[in-house]
Amino acid sequence: MKLNHIPVLPKEVLKYLNVKSSGIYVDATLGGGGHSELILEKLKKGFLYAFDQDIFAIKQSKKLFANNHKIELIHSNFFFLKQELNKRGVFFVDGIIFDLGLSSFQIDDKERGFSYLSNEFLDMRMDREQKLTAHYIINNYSFEKLRNIFFNFGQEKNSSLIAAEIIKKRPLNTTFELVEIADKFNYNRKGHSSKKIFQALRIEVNKELELLQKTLHQCLSLLKEGSSIVVISFHSLEDRLVKNFFRANSIINLPTKLPIVSNFKTVLKIITKKVVKPSLEEIAFNHRSRSAKLRAAVKN
């Protein structure tokens, strides 16, 4: 299987990242290497550190960037971004990009269990070396834990019914077994309950929201003044987290009764007045970009 490295919102990423030819940049989610490729084209004396917890992405990108000496590929979850950079003597960077979507190769890989459209083993691990899988969650978590995961991470209204049916039908081994249960309670609503359940499981397996929140905080101390952080999300939970994080760090929140200091600066300045979405032309060219939402901010 080859990587599909068509980057989402390529022009917008370059616009808001504002790549300097001699800058130090971080691609926190290497994936198919599309955004890394865009950044590298702008670098002359600069350098790029690209992270991915999926070893397949790292191995394939080694081939893609085999002759490029301006990039280092790091097999690691972005949660360890600051630690890994500091180990390399890097304490400040000129920009960071996150593309939080599943890569095409992960969706298409029949052994990963990310897609509800094909019958696969319930895995859903980004990092194949970690122990926790969707299979373990489905077959071992309590009713309460399953219900809460489906409701909180999938925003599924019928989370209780689906969780109860899973407990009743255990053991479940494949994606289609789970799809059959989830869609049983769809009740003619638009869209698939399966999509919500699979999203919820993937978030739980990979601790996506928890690690994203912690990593965004790390980025504040890594960014130089005037440097950008760009985040592309693909569902409302991620987008809300990023939106709230940017807002919280872009407002002045001084204690009451203290004198106002005229030169007080916020940590971030939001540079996307509203969320940026792909054009109709991009969606027609790259269908998987359709739910992408980009937000960007600059370090003050």
Curated annotation (Swiss-Prot):
Q: Where in the cell is it found?
A: Cytoplasm
What are the annotated GO cellular component locations? cytoplasm
Q: Would you say which domain of life the source belongs to?
A: Bacteria
Alphabetized, the UniProt keywords read: Cytoplasm, Methyltransferase, rRNA processing, S-adenosyl-L-methionine, Transferase
Q: Which chemical reaction does it catalyze?
A: cytidine(1402) in 16S rRNA + S-adenosyl-L-methionine = N(4)-methylcytidine(1402) in 16S rRNA + S-adenosyl-L-homocysteine + H(+)
Name the Gene3D superfamilies on file. Putative methyltransferase TM0872, insert domain (1.10.150.170), Vaccinia Virus protein VP39 (3.40.50.150)
Annotated GO biological processes are:
rRNA base methylation
What is the enzyme's main class? transferase
According to its UniProt entry, the function of this protein is described as:
Specifically methylates the N4 position of cytidine in position 1402 (C1402) of 16S rRNA.
Please give the family membership noted in the entry.
Answer: Belongs to the methyltransferase superfamily. RsmH family.
Q: Return the PANTHER family for the record.
A: 12S RRNA N4-METHYLCYTIDINE METHYLTRANSFERASE, S-ADENOSYL-METHYLTRANSFERASE MRAW
Q: What is this protein called?
A: Ribosomal RNA small subunit methyltransferase H
What's the source species for this entry?
Phytoplasma mali (strain AT)
Q: Which gene encodes it?
A: rsmH
